[in-house]
C-alpha cells in the first residue's frame, strides 16, 4: 500500500483554513484525514473536544512536549497549539493523506523535520479582508485581534518557504486550486487530466501560433553563445519550444494560484493575455542554460 502524505495547509489566523479544509474533506477521491490539533485555548461556540481540537490544560500540553508526543507545537496569543504524532502516523500507514491545519510557526518546524510533506500557504485577498474575517468570529476582544493581525504581517513574507501559495478569495475557488494541486502531486484517485495539464496544452497551442520565430532564434543564440565543447554538446539538445511551454505553464499556473479565478486557466484568451505580459517580463538571457533537458520542470 502506498503511504499517505502530510499536507500542511497553513497561513495567518483568520485566512479561512478551517472553511477550506472542511470542503476538501468532503471529497473521497482525495483520501484526506484531518489531524485534530491539541490546544490549551478555550473552546469556541460549537466546537467539540476531539473533533475540532483536543482541549487540554497547560500541564497536559507541557507533558506531551516532554514525551515527544507532538510533531510540532507553537505558542500563539497566550495559548499553545500542537499536532499529536500518533494519529498522523497511523493514518499515513493506511495510505491516507493527513491535513495539518497549523500556524506558521508550527509549519516551519514540520518543514524542517519531516521529508514526506506537501506545503500550501493560504493567503488572504488583502489585510482588510483578513481583519474582517477575524472580527466576524466575534470570539475575541480588539487587543487579541490586533495581536493576530500584527503576527499575520510577519507571517505572510514567509509564504515563499512553501511549495504552493494559494489565495483564499472565496472557498470554492481555493478548494478547486488545492484539489488540482493534490491531483498534480499524485495524491488523489481523480482520473481526469489536471487543470495544469490542460493549461499546458493551451500554452503549447499559443506558442506554436505566435512564438516560433522567437523559439528558433533562441535556439540559434544558445548555440552561438556556447563557449566550450561541453556547452556546445548541451546546446545541441536544447529544445527551446518545450522549455518555453513548460516555463510559461508553470508561471501562469502559479500566478493564478496566488491570485485569480482558477477556471480562467482554461480560457485561451485569458492565457494568451497572461503569456503576452510574461514574454515582456522574462529575461531569457538570464535563464540558466544548464537546464537544456528541461529537468527543472
Swiss-Prot record:
Catalyzed reactions: GMP + ATP = GDP + ADP
Transmembrane regions listed in the UniProt entry: none
Keyword Cytoplasm among UniProt keywords: yes
Enzyme Commission number, as recorded: 2.7.4.8
Protein species of origin: Mycoplasma mycoides subsp. mycoides SC (strain CCUG 32753 / NCTC 10114 / PG1)
Family classification: Belongs to the guanylate kinase family.
Subcellular location: Cytoplasm
Sections of the chain in a coiled coil: none
Name of the protein: Guanylate kinase
Taxonomic lineage from the root: Bacteria, Bacillati, Mycoplasmatota, Mollicutes, Mycoplasmataceae
InterPro entries in UniProt: GK/Ca_channel_bsu, Guanylate_kin-like_dom, Guanylate_kinase, Guanylate_kinase_CS, P-loop_NTPase
Purpose of the protein: Essential for recycling GMP and indirectly, cGMP.
GO-annotated molecular function: ATP binding; guanylate kinase activity
Domain Guanylate kinase-like, residue spans: 4-183
Uppermost EC category: transferase
CC annotations in GO: cytosol
Amino acid at each position: 500500500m502506498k503511504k499517505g502524505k502530510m499536507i500542511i495547509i497553513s497561513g495567518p489566523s483568520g485566512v479561512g483554513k478551517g472553511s477550506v479544509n472542511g470542503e476538501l474533506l468532503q471529497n473521497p477521491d482525495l483520501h484526506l484525514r484531518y489531524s485534530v490539533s491539541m490546544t490549551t485555548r478555550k473552546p469556541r461556540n460549537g466546537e467539540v473536544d476531539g473533533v475540532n481540537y483536543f482541549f487540554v490544560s497547560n500541564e497536559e500540553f507541557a507533558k506531551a512536549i516532554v514525551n515527544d508526543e507532538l510533531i510540532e507545537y507553537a505558542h500563539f496569543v497566550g495559548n499553545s497549539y500542537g499536532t499529536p504524532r500518533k494519529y498522523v502516523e497511523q493514518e499515513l500507514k493506511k495510505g491516507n493523506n493527513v491535513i495539518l491545519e497549523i500556524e506558521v510557526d508550527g509549519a516551519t518546524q514540520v518543514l524542517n523535520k519531516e521529508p514526506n510533506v506537501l506545503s500550501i500557504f493560504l493567503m488572504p485577498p488583502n489585510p482588510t479582508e483578513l481583519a474582517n474575517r477575524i472580527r466576524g468570529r466575534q470570539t475575541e476582544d480588539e487587543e487579541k485581534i490586533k495581536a493576530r493581525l500584527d503576527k499575520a504581517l510577519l507571517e505572510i513574507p514567509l509564504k515563499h518557504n512553501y511549495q504552493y501559495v494559494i489565495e483564499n478569495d472565496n472557498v470554492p475557488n481555493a478548494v478547486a486550486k488545492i484539489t488540482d494541486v493534490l491531483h498534480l502531486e499524485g495524491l488523489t484517485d481523480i482520473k481526469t487530466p489536471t487543470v495544469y495539464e490542460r493549461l499546458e496544452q493551451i500554452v503549447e497551442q499559443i506558442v506554436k501560433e505566435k512564438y516560433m520565430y522567437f523559439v528558433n532564434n533562441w535556439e540559434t543564440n544558445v548555440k552561438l553563445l556556447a563557449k566550450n565543447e561541453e556547452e556546445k554538446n548541451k546546446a545541441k539538445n536544447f529544445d527551446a519550444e518545450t522549455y518555453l511551454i513548460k516555463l510559461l505553464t508553470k508561471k501562469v499556473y502559479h500566478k493564478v494560484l496566488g491570485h485569480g479565478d482558477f477556471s480562467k486557466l482554461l480560457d485561451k484568451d485569458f492565457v494568451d493575455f497572461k503569456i503576452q505580459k510574461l514574454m515582456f517580463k522574462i529575461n531569457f538571457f538570464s535563464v540558466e542554460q544548464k537546464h537544456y533537458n528541461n529537468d527543472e520542470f
